[in-house]
């Protein structure tokens, strides 16, 4: 884990603490801190899925957005973790979350994910090809709260 990943991890943990205190299952909520906007939703078992939209570009000028999955035992998995693949399945289509952005295929995959997550009422999260959670969300809430590609992209 690099220093940037570690600092993002610490930031995410501190933001997650505030999210979990008042999270209503199935409703997206937004938080902001130190240049990161995070959108989180919990399921009924207490798992939390978070979209991290950073406002801080890396040394090459790219925004390294990511997703996190916090499990019920508070272990956290990030799309930036080495050796970890995170895939979101919604509406019978899979979205492999890129571990880095700033390259055409990764940016295109992220764009498609951000476009479509706003339009789905249910999605599954897979970590290393194993189902890790199912999230059922309120569609009206998702449309109001979740970012558009312009708010969470690399364009």
Predicted regions and their residues:
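Bacterial N-terminal signal peptides that target proteins for export
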Residues: 1-10
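N-terminal signal peptide c-region/cleavage motif recognized by signal peptidases
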Residues: 18-20
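A generic "folded-domain core" signal
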Residues: 22-155
């Amino acid at each position: 884990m690099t220093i940037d990943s570690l600092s993002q991890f610490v930031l995410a943990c501190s933001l997650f603490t505030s999210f979990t205190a008042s999270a209503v299952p199935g409703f997206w909520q937004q938080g902001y801190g130190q240049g990161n906007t995070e959108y989180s939703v919990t399921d009924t078992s207490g798992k939390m899925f978070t979209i991290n939209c950073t406002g801080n570009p890396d040394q090459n000028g790219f925004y390294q957005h990511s997703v996190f999955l916090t499990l019920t035992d508070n272990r956290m998995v990030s799309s930036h973790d080495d050796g970890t693949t995170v895939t979101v399945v919604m509406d019978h289509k899979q979205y492999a979350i890129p571990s880095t952005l700033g390259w055409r295929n990764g940016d295109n995959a992220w764009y498609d994910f951000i476009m479509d997550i706003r339009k789905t009422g249910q999605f599954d999260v897979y970590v290393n090809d194993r189902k890790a959670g199912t999230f059922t969300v309120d569609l009206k809430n998702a449309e109001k709260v979740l970012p558009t590609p312009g708010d969470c992209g690399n364009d």
